[in-house]
């Protein structure tokens, strides 16, 4: 039985075996165990980065907004407090 892996390459698998149970030499099954492979390659890092890039972006944007918000509220709070303390004395 022939099938295509995630890169579009045509592979052959014995009947009754799906694409996920093809020979362990195929990149597809190796992909699920990056961390345990001795030959950790930059391709793995790159594909992983491509997959989760958007989540990194969202997290970064959220952190940035949160940081600015915290700074702004602190800044505003300090300004208000100094005005309030001043109005007590005058």
Swiss-Prot record:
<dbReference type="GO" id="GO:0016020">
    <property type="term" value="C:membrane"/>
</dbReference>
<feature type="region of interest" description="Disordered">
    <location>
        <begin position="13"/>
        <end position="34"/>
    </location>
</feature>
<keyword id="KW-1043">Host membrane</keyword>
<feature type="transmembrane region" description="Helical">
    <location>
        <begin position="52"/>
        <end position="72"/>
    </location>
</feature>
<keyword id="KW-0812">Transmembrane</keyword>
<keyword id="KW-0472">Membrane</keyword>
<dbReference type="GO" id="GO:0033644">
    <property type="term" value="C:host cell membrane"/>
</dbReference>
<keyword id="KW-1133">Transmembrane helix</keyword>
<protein>
    <recommendedName>
        <fullName>Uncharacterized protein IIV3-013L</fullName>
    </recommendedName>
</protein>
């Amino acid at each position: 039985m022939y099938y295509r892996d995630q890169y579009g390459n045509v592979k052959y698998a014995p009947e009754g075996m799906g694409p996920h149970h093809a020979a362990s030499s195929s990149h597809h099954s190796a992909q699920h165990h990056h961390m345990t492979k001795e030959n950790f390659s930059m391709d793995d890092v790159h594909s992983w980065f491509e997959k989760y890039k958007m989540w990194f972006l969202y997290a970064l944007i959220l952190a940035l907004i949160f940081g600015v918000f915290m700074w702004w509220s602190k800044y505003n709070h300090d300004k208000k407090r100094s005005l309030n303390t001043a109005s007590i004395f005058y």
